[in-house]
């Protein structure tokens, strides 16, 4: 499994971060397949994003309580595009979050 932590500024607007995850993924051509919460991270927001016509899933989790945002690609959901996109998505999210917090 690949896990990529997204750096959040100390005073990040986490309500805006939720919207930014969705809009940033959409702008990168990713489709939201699922939005839920993870029992192991109470109060978290967890998404599955896919790419049309491709196999594989990128998971993104925002845990406001702990001020954490991370991206996962599980081995059973990996494909050639997912590992590359995980790093690119990290950069895109960090840039978008920095813009709204500056």
Task: Show the residue positions of the predicted features.
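Negatively charged, low-complexity tracts enriched in Asp/Glu with abundant Ser/Thr
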Residues: 1-49
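Hydrophobic beta-strand residues in large extracellular and virion-surface proteins
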Residues: 4-6, 21, 58-60, 69-71, ...
């Amino acid at each position: 499994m690949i896990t990529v932590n997204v750096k959040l500024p100390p005073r990040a607007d986490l309500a805006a971060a939720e919207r930014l995850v969705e809009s940033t993924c959409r702008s990168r051509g990713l489709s939201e397949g699922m939005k839920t919460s993870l029992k192991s991270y109470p109060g978290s927001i967890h998404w599955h994003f896919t790419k049309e016509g491709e196999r594989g899933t990128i998971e993104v989790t925002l845990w406001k309580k702990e001020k954490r945002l991370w991206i996962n690609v599980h081995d059973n959901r990996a494909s050639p595009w997912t590992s590359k996109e995980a790093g690119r998505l990290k950069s895109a999210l960090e840039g978008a979050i920095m813009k709204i917090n500056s």
